[in-house]
Amino acid sequence: MGRPKKTALLVAQQIVEDISRRGNTVGDRLPPEHLMLEHYGVGRGTLRESLRYLELQGVLMLKPGPGGGPIVQQPDGGTLAATLSLLLQFENAPFSTIMEARTALEPTIARLATARIDDAGLARLAENLRLTREQLTDQAAFSANSERFHELVAWSSGNALFGYLFDALSGLIAGASMGITYPRRQRELTCEIHEEIYAAIADGDGDTASHLMSAHITEHTTYLEKRFHKALARPIRWDLDG
């Protein structure tokens, strides 16, 4: 049996439940402190601990000063990336762990995207392909656009867990990308296979999309192992930036 949850965490859970119940959206202010103290039946210190915890989780922004207070935010994959990096540091796991996970996950994600993507999702992928080609000579832009393609495919799978998990994995592998460069031919090949994956998804061909994604991630991993083995072998360290 686990330890009982602290009162502040229980209150934090109730605050999130109340946000959902009221249908609060990003930018909404929560009730003032005196009303929250009365509603949750706790002391000021406990309530503020709950709010600080939710701020760390990306649920709230605590705006100081008159007219401030807790404001609803949209959590993102950064918090998950920070938590995963902390867990993986304690396991002394190398960055190659992330590439192994991507190799296992992304073919399935591409197959799901083929069946579930909508017109808006296809348009976002097409725009990403255009930008990647347009900014091919810019190393930083190429890397960002390339990772963004995979994020878009993950969210197009219709599975929010895959979306957030991939956001986190993408954020973690970015930490290993420091110093990693891609020659012009490698960037062109990436554009080509991204375009082929997009075509398979647009055609509703799940088998081809899955096969192409598997080949793409395997080839990318082989390139990193050959050219940047030390980066992949480096242990993951806790990254609060996510």
Predicted regions and their residues:
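Short linear motifs at protein or domain termini
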Residues: 1-103, 231-232, 238-242
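A broad structural signal for alpha-helix termini and local helix breaks/kinks
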Residues: 40, 157-158, 228
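Conserved amphipathic alpha-helical segments that form helical-bundle/coiled-coil interaction surfaces
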Residues: 98-179, 190-196, 208-222
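Short helix-capping and inter-helix turn/linker motifs at the boundaries of alpha-helical repeat units
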Residues: 185-188
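C-terminal effector-binding regulatory domain of bacterial HTH transcription factors
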Residues: 208-242
